[in-house]
A protein has these predicted regions:
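Extracellular/periplasmic carbohydrate-active domains that bind, remodel
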Residues: 1-151
Length: 151
């Protein structure tokens, strides 16, 4: 998957999973300008109203080239994200391997994120957490819990 490679377009994610259950992403090679594989669950007041989580996600045997993050949870977290297993991944030059982001107006819970067997080459950060990624008035609070990284 190539999305705006070498360009400067904003929000050019490679793969977006939003408000979905029982998802498998495997054998992908992603090169983009933003989040390579991004897990979301609704945005702001509308996301809180619908309140549909993303849960039971497996990401395996994938490569990420450049981009902001190999695996990103958020920033759209209103419906909650839980039970994500990511393994046997390679990051070449991404900003981070695991990127967690939300904002005070998004709310939701992000929990039970498990990453193992991740290879990182020329990656700026292994973990990036930004709980106030986009400054707006608060609708509700977010909660983060249960993260495991193992190599």
């Amino acid at each position: 998957i190539n999305n705006n490679v070498g360009g400067h377009g904003p929000s050019t994610d490679g793969i977006d999973i939003d408000s979905s259950t029982n998802i498998l992403v495997e054998n992908c090679d992603v090169d983009c300008n933003d989040d390579n594989i991004c897990i979301k669950a609704g945005r702001d007041a509308d996301g809180l109203r619908v309140n549909r989580p993303t849960e039971n996600v497996v990401v395996r045997n994938c490569i990420a080239r450049k981009g902001a993050g190999l695996l990103t949870c958020g920033s759209e977290t209103s419906g909650s994200i839980r039970n994500v297993l990511a393994h046997d991944l390679i990051a070449y030059g991404t900003g981070t391997t695991l990127r967690l982001k939300s904002s005070m107006n998004r709310g939701g819970t992000v929990e039970n994120i498990y990453m193992t067997r991740v290879e990182a080459d020329s990656v700026t950060h292994i973990l990036s957490v930004d709980l106030n990624w986009n400054l707006h008035p608060a609708w509700t609070k977010n909660k983060y819990a249960g993260f495991t990284s193992n190599n």
